[in-house]
């Protein structure tokens, strides 16, 4: 994230103000193409690996192994929380200030290339990996699908399809960039769905409390 913010700061002003300039293609459209390929590849490899190496006897693991997996799962949850912050908060708010300062001449502005097509996929990939890890390796998540988990992962994921509606609206209505515009309500609604992770934490606390009553052998 630090490198991305540095890149945006350096090349956003020098090469990102005119989408018809050759330097925009060099520094920003190529950035977009590369990140999309890397994201699809990373998601396929990471999710595929977690699923391929799933534990087929997850209900038979020892309490000690289950505790270890819960700590690994917590690591995934923390990573997801960090990714959600940078995607749905930091870079999203930054995008608002960009549009209040610069007149857009393309949907693929430097701030959009980083916000919509980099920071959002990062938290989607991380959230999906966290969900798959819990589903394939922890007994607490074996009975059906956790509604709390689905809300906390699918909700923020739906921000990405909402981007299409948002860009269409801005193009069709030539709207002023206002945070309170009805067109932005979807970002707020789906963004707050991330609070479903509190329900996941509740499941974790319950599972850990049961484990602590056992001999960890």
Predicted features and spans:
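Cytoplasmic membrane-interface regions of multi-pass membrane proteins
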Residues: 48-70, 96-103, 128-148, 172-176, ...
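Membrane-helix interface motif
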Residues: 3-20, 53, 87-101, 163-175
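Generic alpha-helical transmembrane segments
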Residues: 36-48, 113-132, 192-196
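Interfacial helix-start motif at the membrane-water boundary
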Residues: 25-45, 72-78
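C-terminal transmembrane-bundle signature of multipass membrane proteins
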Residues: 2, 146-217
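Membrane-proximal helix-loop-helix units in multi-pass membrane proteins
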Residues: 78-144
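Perimembrane loop-to-helix junctions flanking transmembrane segments
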Residues: 11-30, 61
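Transmembrane alpha-helical segments of multi-pass membrane proteins
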Residues: 63-88, 144-161
């Amino acid at each position: 994230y630090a490198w991305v913010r540095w890149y945006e700061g350096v090349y956003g002003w020098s090469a990102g103000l005119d989408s018809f300039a050759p330097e925009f293609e060099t520094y920003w459209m190529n950035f977009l193409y590369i990140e999309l390929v890397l994201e699809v590849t990373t998601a396929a490899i990471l999710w595929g690996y977690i699923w391929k190496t799933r534990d087929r006897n997850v209900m038979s693991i020892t309490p000690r192994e289950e505790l270890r997996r819960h700590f690994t799962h917590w690591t995934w949850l923390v990573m997801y929380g960090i990714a959600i912050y940078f995607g749905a908060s930091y870079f999203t708010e930054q995008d608002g200030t960009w549009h209040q300062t610069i007149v857009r001449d393309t949907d693929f502005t430097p701030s959009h290339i980083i916000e919509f097509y980099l920071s959002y996929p990062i938290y989607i990939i991380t959230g999906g990996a966290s969900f798959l890890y819990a589903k394939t390796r922890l007994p607490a998540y074996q009975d059906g699908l956790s509604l709390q988990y689905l809300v906390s992962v699918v909700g923020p994921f739906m921000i990405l399809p909402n981007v299409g509606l948002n860009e269409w609206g801005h193009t069709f209505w030539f709207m002023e960039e206002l945070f309170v515009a009805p067109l932005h309500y979807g970002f707020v609604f789906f963004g707050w769905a991330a609070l479903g992770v509190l329900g996941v934490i509740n499941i974790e606390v319950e599972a850990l409390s049961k484990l602590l009553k056992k001999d960890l052998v």
